[in-house]
């Protein structure tokens, strides 16, 4: 990890996060990667592929370095997920990670690395749709992995929000998060407001979630910036055009 650097983030991301924290120091920051560096992956590509088992330990150290580097900038990473949407290998970037692979990574590499470095950042598993409650349950059914895990995270592009209750019933001592749902450029304001309040805000809380996140916070009128192949119609809570900010439906959902 001799080339590890946050230099790309110091221009925009880190200054914005510091401004947010200055306005509200109680804000919690969660990190969820789309992909490891491509040299750690089976296909040496930003799209899809798996994390090579021989790189599990170095990727765990990558998380450690990231959390420590952000802390040096005054930003505490409250929680991380090992992988955003680990069953979605078509995005650019993305990574496919099975429940067995995530279990191995957490119990044998990430958890021990955090422990050795004295890092208290929470580890949250799954971070994908409500159609697969079996995925986080499989991880939590492994006692060695469970010892390092704070909870499970969900999205609702597939499945039913009651999946959170299934995980709660299997492991009531672990937290539940709802970490992503987007509103689209072609959707109606009233339709999105009704659906998100019913499912994302009320529905998740009635199914044991302590967190409900809208995605994303802000973008420009062309729904950028985004990665090549990234979402071209995901609307921010606010649209930024020059010095003007327009509030969108996610602003009112939040």
Predicted regions and their residues:
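Short, conserved phosphate-binding/catalytic loop or strand-edge motifs used
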Residues: 82-88
